[in-house]
Amino acid sequence: MICVCLLMLMTPMAARADITLTFGTYAADKPTVTVKKYRPFLTFLSNRLGEALGEKVIIRMTVAKEYQEGIDQLASGEVDFARFGPASYVHVMKQNPGIQIVAMESKKGRKRFKGVIVVHRDSAITELSDLAGLSFAFGDELSTIGRYLAQSHLLEAGIDSDDLHTYDYLGRHDLVGEAVGAGKFTAGALKESTYKKLIAKGVPIRILASFDNVTKPWLASSTLPENVLLAMREIMLSSENEEIVRRVSKNGFLQGSDSDYDLIRDAMEQSQAF
């Protein structure tokens, strides 16, 4: 969805058009945290795009309540570009193969980082196999770490859904960690950065296991004009040393390709046996 807003001028000269873009994401953590995280970078990006395109660029932001809502918004062109988790990228490509990767987030120059499975700090559990007969908290049903990679990892340890006493999907990563810390579930899966934030807040959890994940892609809708996509990509790939960029991607961005997410496709396929 790309809108053109006309400036009303006091002269009969042709009005200059502003480019208005909508950025979309979903709340893997609290929505207020999500907005606070991205707004400064989006302001930076709109200014740089304006310089590159020679037109004023306005970027609006929308935060979907659920993963599927965010996926649908990008697939339909309701938003022009988005930041998704890897599994959401795989899903949105199935809905609209015209989606393109703008760039991937960098983790110290790499395209991989860690997801974690946690237990209560005082838990006696030392192995994933110890979870048989106990409870597990997953994130969203479409979450890369919170579902697909966690379930794949559990399967490798010989644990499937029938082996658990109970399990549930809690949505956000922070809710998973808090539930485990409160003793509502024996274990749960969340991203490492959220784990560190919860530890800093005093939530009594510890890491039982960790696993590789692929960094998040920034994606362009199939309707985003090519010149805007190319300008956005150039800005993101050349801005790794900008402090404002490090707020959303600590080490900047890398060139991305569809094959970077084969690890996730494999995990999603494996999780069907869970």
Residue ranges: model-predicted function:
Residues M1-E78, R246-F274:
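N-terminal hydrophobic or amphipathic helices and topogenic motifs
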Residues D18-P31, A103, K107-V119, A200-E242, ...:
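Periplasmic-binding protein-like
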Residues S46-G54, A75, V79, L155, ...:
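Sec-exported extracytoplasmic/periplasmic mature domains
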Residues A64-A82, Q95-N96, S129, H173-F185:
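Short helices/loops that flank or line small-molecule/ion binding pockets
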Residues R83-N96, H153-E156, E178-R206, S210:
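A ligand-binding cleft/hinge motif common to bilobed small-molecule-binding domains
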